[in-house]
């Protein structure tokens, strides 16, 4: 059974796309406004957080899912660390962690004799102490800290 894991560099590509989409949407909507000036994505995030302009509030409502997705990914970046995030950290679904360990332990050089019966849930509970957890799209994932 192949365990499906995520890699943060794939999420990073989605994040960059979201940032571009949010910024383009904002620029297209407000480029004619008297207060408008070009800004970085980070500057845009700060601006919309502090803005009291009703048009900006309406734009935020219409762009809610993209903003939510970007903020969720920023939370992962905060936990993983930006350097590691962009390098591609493997995210393992928590509910599949015992199966993941059973699959990868031999590849890591651990030979388990056939006559032993391993309770992989117990192994996962012990090994989980060496991992950190993040949540992405409602799913909890472990990653190696």
Regions of interest found by a model, annotated:
Residues 1-145:
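Acidic interaction surfaces
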């Amino acid at each position: 059974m192949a365990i499906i894991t995520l890699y943060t560099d794939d999420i990073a590509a989605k994040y960059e796309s979201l940032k571009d989409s949010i910024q383009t949407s904002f620029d297209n909507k407000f480029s004619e406004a008297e207060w408008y000036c070009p800004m970085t994505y980070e500057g845009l995030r700060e601006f919309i957080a502090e803005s009291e302009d009703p048009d900006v509030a309406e734009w935020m409502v219409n762009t809610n899912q993209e903003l939510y997705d970007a903020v969720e990914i920023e939370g992962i970046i905060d936990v993983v660390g930006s350097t590691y995030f962009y390098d591609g950290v493997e995210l393992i679904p928590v509910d599949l962690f015992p199966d993941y360990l059973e699959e990868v332990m031999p590849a890591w050089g651990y030979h388990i004799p056939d006559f032993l019966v391993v309770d992989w849930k117990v192994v996962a509970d012990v090994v989980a102490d060496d991992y950190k957890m993040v949540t992405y799209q409602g799913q909890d994932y472990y990653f190696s800290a």
